[in-house]
Amino acid sequence: MTNIRKTHPLMKIINNSFIDLPAPSNISSWWNFGSLLGICLTLQILTGLFLAMHYTSDTTTAFSSVTHICRDVNYGWLIRYLHANGASMFFICLFLHVGRGLYYGSYMFMETWNIGVILLFAVMATAFMGYVLPWGQMSFWGATVITNLLSAIPYIGTDLVEWIWGGFSVDKATLTRFFAFHFILPFIIAALAGVHLLFLHETGSNNPSGLSSDTDKIPFHPYYTIKDILGALVMILALSILVLFSPDLLGDPDNYIPANPLNTPPHIKPEWYFLFAYAILRSIPNKLGGVLALVFSILILALMPLLHTSKQRSMMFRPISQCLFWLLVADLLTLTWIGGQPVEHPFIIIGQLASILYFALILILMPLASLMENNLLKW
Protein backbone atom coordinates (compact mmCIF):
# COMPACT_ATOMS: atom_id res chain seq x y z
CA MET A 1 0.00 0.00 0.00
CA THR A 2 1.30 3.47 -0.95
CA ASN A 3 1.89 5.96 1.83
CA ILE A 4 -1.16 8.21 2.43
CA ARG A 5 0.96 11.34 2.20
CA LYS A 6 1.72 10.47 -1.44
CA THR A 7 -1.86 9.67 -2.46
CA HIS A 8 -4.23 11.93 -0.48
CA PRO A 9 -5.07 15.02 -2.62
CA LEU A 10 -4.21 17.53 0.14
CA MET A 11 -1.34 15.61 1.77
CA LYS A 12 0.20 15.14 -1.67
CA ILE A 13 0.57 18.92 -2.12
CA ILE A 14 2.17 19.29 1.32
CA ASN A 15 4.40 16.28 0.65
CA ASN A 16 5.64 17.66 -2.67
CA SER A 17 6.24 21.10 -1.15
CA PHE A 18 7.84 20.34 2.23
CA ILE A 19 8.78 16.66 2.49
CA ASP A 20 9.83 14.93 -0.74
CA LEU A 21 10.80 18.19 -2.45
CA PRO A 22 14.17 17.79 -4.23
CA ALA A 23 16.41 20.62 -2.96
CA PRO A 24 19.98 21.66 -3.86
CA SER A 25 22.52 20.14 -1.47
CA ASN A 26 24.46 23.38 -1.00
CA ILE A 27 21.90 26.07 -0.09
CA SER A 28 23.17 28.12 2.86
CA SER A 29 21.41 29.83 5.77
CA TRP A 30 20.54 32.70 3.41
CA TRP A 31 17.83 30.35 2.08
CA ASN A 32 16.20 30.17 5.54
CA PHE A 33 14.33 33.47 5.24
CA GLY A 34 11.44 32.14 3.14
CA SER A 35 10.32 29.86 5.98
CA LEU A 36 11.03 32.60 8.55
CA LEU A 37 8.77 34.98 6.61
CA GLY A 38 6.04 32.32 6.68
CA ILE A 39 6.42 32.06 10.46
CA CYS A 40 6.35 35.87 10.79
CA LEU A 41 3.16 36.08 8.72
CA THR A 42 1.49 33.35 10.79
CA LEU A 43 2.52 35.11 14.02
CA GLN A 44 1.23 38.47 12.75
CA ILE A 45 -2.13 37.01 11.68
CA LEU A 46 -2.60 35.23 15.03
CA THR A 47 -1.54 38.14 17.27
CA GLY A 48 -3.47 40.54 15.02
CA LEU A 49 -6.61 38.44 15.35
CA PHE A 50 -6.43 38.55 19.15
CA LEU A 51 -5.75 42.31 19.10
CA ALA A 52 -8.75 42.85 16.80
CA MET A 53 -10.96 41.18 19.42
CA HIS A 54 -10.30 44.11 21.79
CA TYR A 55 -9.51 47.00 19.42
CA THR A 56 -12.09 49.61 18.36
CA SER A 57 -11.53 51.50 15.10
CA ASP A 58 -13.10 54.77 16.22
CA THR A 59 -11.12 58.01 16.65
CA THR A 60 -12.55 58.61 20.12
CA THR A 61 -11.77 55.14 21.51
CA ALA A 62 -8.90 53.68 19.38
CA PHE A 63 -6.07 55.00 21.61
CA SER A 64 -7.95 53.98 24.78
CA SER A 65 -8.64 50.50 23.41
CA VAL A 66 -4.90 49.94 22.81
CA THR A 67 -4.19 51.15 26.37
CA HIS A 68 -6.94 48.77 27.59
CA ILE A 69 -5.28 45.87 25.70
CA CYS A 70 -1.93 46.60 27.39
CA ARG A 71 -3.32 47.14 30.90
CA ASP A 72 -6.43 44.98 31.31
CA VAL A 73 -6.39 42.12 28.80
CA ASN A 74 -4.65 38.90 29.92
CA TYR A 75 -1.18 39.03 28.35
CA GLY A 76 -2.49 41.86 26.15
CA TRP A 77 0.84 43.71 26.51
CA LEU A 78 2.62 40.59 25.21
CA ILE A 79 0.27 40.17 22.23
CA ARG A 80 0.55 43.88 21.36
CA TYR A 81 4.36 43.97 21.55
CA LEU A 82 4.71 40.65 19.71
CA HIS A 83 2.60 42.17 16.93
CA ALA A 84 4.52 45.49 16.83
CA ASN A 85 7.99 43.94 17.03
CA GLY A 86 6.90 40.99 14.88
CA ALA A 87 6.49 43.55 12.10
CA SER A 88 10.12 44.60 12.61
CA MET A 89 11.28 40.98 12.44
CA PHE A 90 9.13 40.55 9.32
CA PHE A 91 10.94 43.43 7.61
CA ILE A 92 14.40 42.29 8.76
CA CYS A 93 13.67 38.88 7.18
CA LEU A 94 12.20 40.56 4.08
CA PHE A 95 15.25 42.77 3.51
CA LEU A 96 17.64 39.84 4.02
CA HIS A 97 15.50 37.65 1.72
CA VAL A 98 15.54 40.30 -1.04
CA GLY A 99 19.27 40.93 -0.46
CA ARG A 100 19.95 37.20 -0.87
CA GLY A 101 17.95 37.25 -4.13
CA LEU A 102 20.00 40.18 -5.45
CA TYR A 103 23.36 38.67 -4.44
CA TYR A 104 22.77 35.18 -5.82
CA GLY A 105 20.80 36.18 -8.93
CA SER A 106 17.53 34.59 -7.77
CA TYR A 107 15.71 37.31 -9.74
CA MET A 108 16.34 35.25 -12.88
CA PHE A 109 13.24 33.28 -11.85
CA MET A 110 11.08 36.07 -13.28
CA GLU A 111 7.61 34.92 -12.12
CA THR A 112 8.75 34.14 -8.56
CA TRP A 113 10.65 37.45 -8.37
CA ASN A 114 7.76 39.59 -9.67
CA ILE A 115 5.30 38.01 -7.23
CA GLY A 116 7.91 38.75 -4.55
CA VAL A 117 8.00 42.45 -5.53
CA ILE A 118 4.17 42.56 -5.33
CA LEU A 119 4.40 40.86 -1.92
CA LEU A 120 6.90 43.51 -0.74
CA PHE A 121 4.50 46.31 -1.75
CA ALA A 122 1.59 44.51 -0.05
CA VAL A 123 3.53 44.04 3.21
CA MET A 124 4.64 47.70 3.18
CA ALA A 125 1.02 48.84 2.64
CA THR A 126 -0.16 46.59 5.48
CA ALA A 127 2.53 47.83 7.88
CA PHE A 128 1.77 51.47 7.05
CA MET A 129 -1.95 51.03 7.74
CA GLY A 130 -1.24 49.09 10.92
CA TYR A 131 0.91 51.96 12.22
CA VAL A 132 -2.11 54.30 11.89
CA LEU A 133 -4.41 52.14 14.05
CA PRO A 134 -3.18 53.02 17.62
CA TRP A 135 -4.15 56.63 16.77
CA GLY A 136 -1.16 58.25 18.44
CA GLN A 137 0.50 61.45 17.21
CA MET A 138 2.84 59.68 14.79
CA SER A 139 -0.04 57.47 13.57
CA PHE A 140 -2.16 60.49 12.67
CA TRP A 141 0.56 62.66 11.18
CA GLY A 142 2.20 59.74 9.37
CA ALA A 143 -1.16 58.93 7.76
CA THR A 144 -1.68 62.60 6.87
CA VAL A 145 1.77 63.06 5.31
CA ILE A 146 1.92 59.78 3.36
CA THR A 147 -1.65 59.86 2.00
CA ASN A 148 -1.11 63.52 1.07
CA LEU A 149 1.67 62.41 -1.31
CA LEU A 150 -1.03 61.19 -3.71
CA SER A 151 -2.10 64.81 -4.20
CA ALA A 152 1.07 65.17 -6.30
CA ILE A 153 -0.62 63.12 -9.05
CA PRO A 154 -1.64 65.65 -11.73
CA TYR A 155 -5.34 66.48 -12.22
CA ILE A 156 -6.87 63.69 -10.06
CA GLY A 157 -4.52 63.98 -7.04
CA THR A 158 -6.67 66.07 -4.67
CA ASP A 159 -9.86 64.12 -5.42
CA LEU A 160 -7.97 60.86 -4.92
CA VAL A 161 -6.65 61.91 -1.50
CA GLU A 162 -10.10 63.03 -0.30
CA TRP A 163 -11.57 59.77 -1.60
CA ILE A 164 -9.01 57.74 0.40
CA TRP A 165 -9.59 59.92 3.49
CA GLY A 166 -13.38 59.64 3.19
CA GLY A 167 -13.58 63.37 3.98
CA PHE A 168 -11.47 66.52 3.99
CA SER A 169 -8.90 65.26 6.49
CA VAL A 170 -7.67 62.06 8.15
CA ASP A 171 -10.59 61.23 10.44
CA LYS A 172 -12.97 58.49 11.65
CA ALA A 173 -13.72 57.22 8.12
CA THR A 174 -9.98 56.92 7.37
CA LEU A 175 -9.27 54.97 10.56
CA THR A 176 -12.17 52.56 9.97
CA ARG A 177 -11.19 51.76 6.39
CA PHE A 178 -7.50 51.42 7.32
CA PHE A 179 -8.51 48.85 9.96
CA ALA A 180 -10.58 46.95 7.38
CA PHE A 181 -7.71 46.92 4.87
CA HIS A 182 -5.14 46.09 7.55
CA PHE A 183 -7.25 43.06 8.52
CA ILE A 184 -7.80 41.70 4.98
CA LEU A 185 -4.35 42.31 3.44
CA PRO A 186 -2.41 39.66 5.44
CA PHE A 187 -4.75 36.98 4.04
CA ILE A 188 -4.13 38.30 0.52
CA ILE A 189 -0.39 38.20 1.34
CA ALA A 190 -0.74 34.56 2.46
CA ALA A 191 -2.46 33.69 -0.84
CA LEU A 192 0.25 35.53 -2.82
CA ALA A 193 2.93 33.68 -0.81
CA GLY A 194 1.28 30.43 -1.97
CA VAL A 195 1.55 31.61 -5.59
CA HIS A 196 5.17 32.68 -4.89
CA LEU A 197 5.92 29.13 -3.71
CA LEU A 198 4.01 27.60 -6.64
CA PHE A 199 6.19 29.48 -9.15
CA LEU A 200 9.36 28.64 -7.19
CA HIS A 201 8.55 24.91 -7.30
CA GLU A 202 8.15 25.11 -11.09
CA THR A 203 11.90 25.80 -11.37
CA GLY A 204 13.32 24.60 -8.06
CA SER A 205 15.55 26.65 -5.77
CA ASN A 206 18.60 28.59 -6.87
CA ASN A 207 21.84 27.93 -4.95
CA PRO A 208 24.93 29.97 -3.95
CA SER A 209 26.96 28.97 -7.02
CA GLY A 210 24.20 30.00 -9.43
CA LEU A 211 24.82 26.76 -11.36
CA SER A 212 22.26 24.03 -12.07
CA SER A 213 21.86 21.69 -9.10
CA ASP A 214 19.91 18.98 -10.97
CA THR A 215 22.84 16.57 -10.63
CA ASP A 216 22.92 16.80 -6.83
CA LYS A 217 19.56 17.04 -5.08
CA ILE A 218 18.58 15.98 -1.55
CA PRO A 219 15.08 15.62 -0.01
CA PHE A 220 13.79 18.69 1.82
CA HIS A 221 12.90 16.55 4.85
CA PRO A 222 14.80 15.94 7.14
CA TYR A 223 17.74 18.07 5.95
CA TYR A 224 16.09 21.45 5.44
CA THR A 225 13.19 20.96 7.87
CA ILE A 226 15.68 20.69 10.75
CA LYS A 227 17.66 23.62 9.34
CA ASP A 228 14.48 25.74 9.12
CA ILE A 229 13.56 24.80 12.71
CA LEU A 230 16.99 26.00 13.89
CA GLY A 231 16.53 29.28 11.99
CA ALA A 232 13.05 29.68 13.48
CA LEU A 233 14.39 29.13 17.02
CA VAL A 234 17.08 31.78 16.51
CA MET A 235 14.48 34.26 15.20
CA ILE A 236 12.01 33.50 18.01
CA LEU A 237 14.83 33.99 20.54
CA ALA A 238 15.73 37.38 19.00
CA LEU A 239 12.06 38.45 18.94
CA SER A 240 11.54 37.28 22.54
CA ILE A 241 14.55 39.29 23.75
CA LEU A 242 13.25 42.37 21.91
CA VAL A 243 9.67 42.00 23.19
CA LEU A 244 10.52 41.11 26.79
CA PHE A 245 13.48 43.42 27.43
CA SER A 246 13.05 46.50 25.20
CA PRO A 247 9.64 46.42 23.51
CA ASP A 248 9.70 50.16 22.70
CA LEU A 249 13.23 50.21 21.29
CA LEU A 250 12.09 50.48 17.66
CA GLY A 251 8.93 52.53 18.27
CA ASP A 252 8.42 56.30 18.43
CA PRO A 253 7.71 57.87 21.86
CA ASP A 254 5.36 60.37 20.12
CA ASN A 255 2.94 57.52 19.49
CA TYR A 256 2.20 57.40 23.23
CA ILE A 257 0.60 60.85 22.85
CA PRO A 258 -3.02 60.62 21.58
CA ALA A 259 -3.54 62.01 18.05
CA ASN A 260 -4.04 65.78 18.00
CA PRO A 261 -4.79 67.41 14.62
CA LEU A 262 -3.97 70.85 16.11
CA ASN A 263 -0.43 69.97 17.19
CA THR A 264 2.17 68.84 14.64
CA PRO A 265 5.12 66.82 16.05
CA PRO A 266 8.54 68.46 15.40
CA HIS A 267 9.83 65.47 13.40
CA ILE A 268 7.35 63.33 11.48
CA LYS A 269 8.97 60.03 10.58
CA PRO A 270 7.74 56.51 9.79
CA GLU A 271 8.84 53.25 11.43
CA TRP A 272 12.53 52.33 10.93
CA TYR A 273 11.85 49.93 8.03
CA PHE A 274 10.49 52.76 5.83
CA LEU A 275 13.21 55.29 6.62
CA PHE A 276 15.39 54.49 3.56
CA ALA A 277 12.45 55.19 1.21
CA TYR A 278 11.43 58.25 3.27
CA ALA A 279 14.98 59.64 2.92
CA ILE A 280 14.80 59.22 -0.88
CA LEU A 281 11.39 60.95 -0.89
CA ARG A 282 12.71 63.92 1.14
CA SER A 283 15.93 64.29 -0.84
CA ILE A 284 14.06 65.63 -3.90
CA PRO A 285 12.78 69.20 -3.42
CA ASN A 286 9.82 68.62 -5.79
CA LYS A 287 6.66 66.87 -4.52
CA LEU A 288 5.86 64.81 -7.64
CA GLY A 289 9.57 64.03 -8.21
CA GLY A 290 9.89 62.82 -4.62
CA VAL A 291 6.83 60.57 -4.91
CA LEU A 292 8.13 59.08 -8.19
CA ALA A 293 11.57 58.46 -6.62
CA LEU A 294 9.89 56.85 -3.60
CA VAL A 295 7.83 54.44 -5.74
CA PHE A 296 10.70 53.74 -8.12
CA SER A 297 13.10 53.00 -5.23
CA ILE A 298 11.11 49.78 -4.64
CA LEU A 299 9.79 49.22 -8.17
CA ILE A 300 13.40 49.21 -9.44
CA LEU A 301 13.59 45.64 -8.07
CA ALA A 302 11.28 44.53 -10.90
CA LEU A 303 13.94 45.73 -13.38
CA MET A 304 16.70 43.57 -11.88
CA PRO A 305 16.35 40.69 -14.43
CA LEU A 306 16.64 43.25 -17.27
CA LEU A 307 19.71 44.89 -15.71
CA HIS A 308 21.56 41.57 -15.37
CA THR A 309 24.44 41.80 -17.87
CA SER A 310 26.75 39.16 -16.38
CA LYS A 311 27.25 35.74 -17.94
CA GLN A 312 27.25 34.27 -14.46
CA ARG A 313 24.09 34.17 -12.37
CA SER A 314 25.46 34.50 -8.85
CA MET A 315 27.90 37.08 -7.44
CA MET A 316 29.82 34.28 -5.73
CA PHE A 317 32.69 34.45 -8.25
CA ARG A 318 32.40 38.17 -9.12
CA PRO A 319 34.48 40.29 -6.70
CA ILE A 320 33.80 43.68 -8.37
CA SER A 321 30.04 43.14 -8.25
CA GLN A 322 30.40 41.97 -4.64
CA CYS A 323 32.06 45.26 -3.68
CA LEU A 324 29.27 47.23 -5.35
CA PHE A 325 26.62 45.06 -3.67
CA TRP A 326 28.04 45.77 -0.21
CA LEU A 327 28.35 49.44 -1.13
CA LEU A 328 24.61 49.33 -1.91
CA VAL A 329 23.95 47.77 1.53
CA ALA A 330 26.03 50.52 3.21
CA ASP A 331 24.16 53.13 1.14
CA LEU A 332 20.77 51.76 2.28
CA LEU A 333 21.94 51.86 5.92
CA THR A 334 23.03 55.49 5.37
CA LEU A 335 19.61 56.32 3.89
CA THR A 336 17.91 54.65 6.88
CA TRP A 337 19.96 56.83 9.25
CA ILE A 338 19.23 60.00 7.23
CA GLY A 339 15.49 59.26 7.14
CA GLY A 340 15.39 59.55 10.93
CA GLN A 341 17.29 62.87 11.03
CA PRO A 342 15.80 66.39 10.83
CA VAL A 343 15.83 68.19 7.45
CA GLU A 344 18.89 70.40 8.00
CA HIS A 345 22.55 70.68 7.04
CA PRO A 346 24.51 68.34 6.66
CA PHE A 347 21.75 65.68 6.51
CA ILE A 348 20.10 67.14 3.39
CA ILE A 349 23.20 66.83 1.20
CA ILE A 350 24.13 63.40 2.63
CA GLY A 351 20.60 62.16 1.83
CA GLN A 352 20.76 63.55 -1.71
CA LEU A 353 24.15 61.96 -2.40
CA ALA A 354 23.03 58.63 -0.92
CA SER A 355 19.85 58.72 -3.07
CA ILE A 356 21.84 59.43 -6.25
CA LEU A 357 24.29 56.64 -5.36
CA TYR A 358 21.39 54.20 -4.75
CA PHE A 359 19.97 54.64 -8.26
CA ALA A 360 23.42 54.93 -9.89
CA LEU A 361 24.58 51.64 -8.35
CA ILE A 362 21.56 49.66 -9.53
CA LEU A 363 21.00 51.26 -12.94
CA ILE A 364 24.56 52.04 -14.06
CA LEU A 365 27.47 50.81 -11.93
CA MET A 366 26.42 47.19 -11.29
CA PRO A 367 25.51 46.40 -14.94
CA LEU A 368 28.82 48.01 -16.05
CA ALA A 369 30.79 46.01 -13.46
CA SER A 370 29.16 42.81 -14.77
CA LEU A 371 30.20 43.63 -18.35
CA MET A 372 33.72 44.39 -17.13
CA GLU A 373 33.90 41.03 -15.32
CA ASN A 374 32.75 39.25 -18.50
CA ASN A 375 35.67 40.83 -20.37
CA LEU A 376 38.17 40.11 -17.60
CA LEU A 377 37.17 36.43 -17.76
CA LYS A 378 37.28 36.59 -21.61
CA TRP A 379 33.66 35.42 -21.81
Curated annotation (Swiss-Prot):
It is a multi-pass membrane protein. GO terms for cellular component: mitochondrial inner membrane; respiratory chain complex III. Changing residue 122 to T: In strain: Isolate SIK0557. Keywords: Electron transport, Heme, Iron, Membrane, Metal-binding, Mitochondrion, Mitochondrion inner membrane, Respiratory chain, Transmembrane, Transmembrane helix, Transport, Ubiquinone. The chain crosses the membrane at residues 33-53, 77-98, 113-133, 178-198, 226-246, 288-308, 320-340, 347-367. GO terms for biological process: mitochondrial electron transport, ubiquinol to cytochrome c. One of its GO terms (molecular function) is ubiquinol-cytochrome-c reductase activity. A ubiquinone binds at residue 201. Its cofactor is heme b. Heme b b562 binds at residues 83, 182. Binds 2 heme b groups non-covalently. Its main location: mitochondrion. It is found in: Mitochondrion inner membrane. PROSITE patterns: CYTB_CTER, CYTB_NTER. Pfam families: Cytochrom_B_C, Cytochrome_B. CDD domains: cytochrome_b_C, Cytochrome_b_N. InterPro entries: Cyt_b/b6_C, Cyt_b/b6_C_sf, Cyt_b/b6_N, Cytb/b6-like_sf, Cytochrome_b, Cytochrome_b_C_euk/bac, Cytochrome_b_N_euk/bac, Di-haem_cyt_TM. Heme b b566 binds at residues 97, 196. The keyword Translocase does not apply. Heme 1 (or BL or b562) is low-potential and absorbs at about 562 nm, and heme 2 (or BH or b566) is high-potential and absorbs at about 566 nm. Belongs to the cytochrome b family. The cytochrome bc1 complex contains 11 subunits: 3 respiratory subunits (MT-CYB, CYC1 and UQCRFS1), 2 core proteins (UQCRC1 and UQCRC2) and 6 low-molecular weight proteins (UQCRH/QCR6, UQCRB/QCR7, UQCRQ/QCR8, UQCR10/QCR9, UQCR11/QCR10 and a cleavage product of UQCRFS1). This cytochrome bc1 complex then forms a dimer. Component of the ubiquinol-cytochrome c reductase complex (complex III or cytochrome b-c1 complex) that is part of the mitochondrial respiratory chain. The b-c1 complex mediates electron transfer from ubiquinol to cytochrome c. Contributes to the generation of a proton gradient across the mitochondrial membrane that is then used for ATP synthesis. This is Cytochrome b. It comes from Euroscaptor micrura (Himalayan mole). The gene is MT-CYB.
